[in-house]
Amino acid sequence: MRPEDLNDLSLLGQKSVPYIFEYQPEVLEAFPNRHPENDYFVKFNAPEFTSLCPITNQPDFATIYISYIPDEKLVESKSLKLYLFSFRNHGDFHENCINVIGKDLVKLMEPRYLEVWGKFTPRGGISIDPYYNYGKPGTKYEQMAEHRLFNHDLYPETIDNR
């Protein structure tokens, strides 16, 4: 990593970072992709995602899977961690949380392709697993997004009890 790539990163390396308990997309930070000529996936698994049910105010837990093909920018992982943590006291439905996360990451990075899959633990005997994806309009990634959306759960996993 070149020193100038770190100029806009304010959270990485800080020993004392305030944890925000309300949704705050402003905490997300990006840095330059040093390999924009390559197509490659970056994947994050966040097994401790928590938000609140907007009706009951009860906590909802999920593993969030974020995969993307970067273009010019990548998301900085500590800022992503703090961003996901900011949902802790945010009241919203599972489907909206996943769509908001996806749209915030698209706004930040303008990736070639991005998908966000939330696997929420069951409440009332039902688990909800919303899936969001995006492909850069007018590119092969737009068709890729459509194909993956239509086929993303073609062979569903065996649901254990998470």
From Swiss-Prot:
Any Gene Ontology biological process: queuosine biosynthetic process
Function: Catalyzes the NADPH-dependent reduction of 7-cyano-7-deazaguanine (preQ0) to 7-aminomethyl-7-deazaguanine (preQ1).
Main location (coarse class): cytoplasm
Catalytic machinery residues: 53 (thioimide intermediate), 60 (proton donor)
Species of provenance: Exiguobacterium sibiricum (strain DSM 17290 / CCUG 55495 / CIP 109462 / JCM 13490 / 255-15)
Gene Ontology molecular function terms on file: preQ1 synthase activity
One cellular component term from this protein's GO annotations in UniProt: cytoplasm
Pathway info: tRNA modification; tRNA-queuosine biosynthesis
Localisation per UniProt entry: Cytoplasm
One Pfam family here: QueF
NCBIfam families given in the database record: QueF-II (TIGR03139)
Enzyme Commission designation: 1.7.1.13
Family from the record: Belongs to the GTP cyclohydrolase I family. QueF type 1 subfamily.
Positions with a binding annotation for substrate: 75-77, 94-95
Keyword Oxidoreductase: yes
Keywords linked to the UniProt accession: Cytoplasm, NADP, Oxidoreductase, Queuosine biosynthesis
Name recorded for this polypeptide: NADPH-dependent 7-cyano-7-deazaguanine reductase
Gene from which this protein is expressed: queF
Reaction catalyzed: 7-aminomethyl-7-carbaguanine + 2 NADP(+) = 7-cyano-7-deazaguanine + 2 NADPH + 3 H(+)
Domain of life, per lineage: Bacteria
